């Protein structure tokens, strides 16, 4: 996309209305579709940043059967056996399985049961396979397709693609779901942890919320940059669009209907950050607690509190890569935010040179 021209499809939301056009442009180089979860959530959140009525729920509830995710997946599967003008077909590969089968016996069993159930659902919907974040998941999910006895689902009939206003509305459809303090803590904890992992040189990392450190019944999930971005993005929505809580919270005193306000965010940020600083080296590298972790916290705080949503979270990570100086990080973040707002310019170059 560095040399993109007008008309280029920039994101997943737009791509769902141009599935056949993408295939036509790539021609014989096109193999199939993949329904990524985080990427589509990010795409919708960015596209709907202007709409104050669009507020996501807890991220745990935005599954592939939730509202806009369900409709996104359905459009992709409809394109699977729709031939292009040259008679070529394409296959659909299900979303990424982030589970890692490492933990307590009970924790692994429960997580693997969910993973297999998810794979069975995708297979029944028309997926010809899925990809996994860890090689140990291959023998766990592969039998789902092996049991069917078919190499793929080419030839299976699906309803044809349509392009109606109802189709378009479905791609951003929200449905009632929880928005809670527990959900906010999970978003914040993992969001900061990913920023810290990136600063340590890891593009992908096994993470879970700090409140579950030491609990081997709760498994780590393999996460990448989309994780950090969407988690902070949802918190930004809650704060700046008037997201209201759906459950009481005894610890903070928050009640059903309370708005997710800046003071509440700052309190949760301080508490979750403190948990990470006190965590064992197994969960948060000790050598990061005075170097990259404070920088990750600063990025998260700036991203969520700023009135204007920052479109490129990755830029804030990149301009601070190899930087362990919090004061310098604050200068770079402010420089970036000023350039973005005043000049509509990104800073993508290495600021160390």
Cite the ranges covered by each PLM segment.
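Conserved alpha/beta-domain cores
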Residues: 1-353
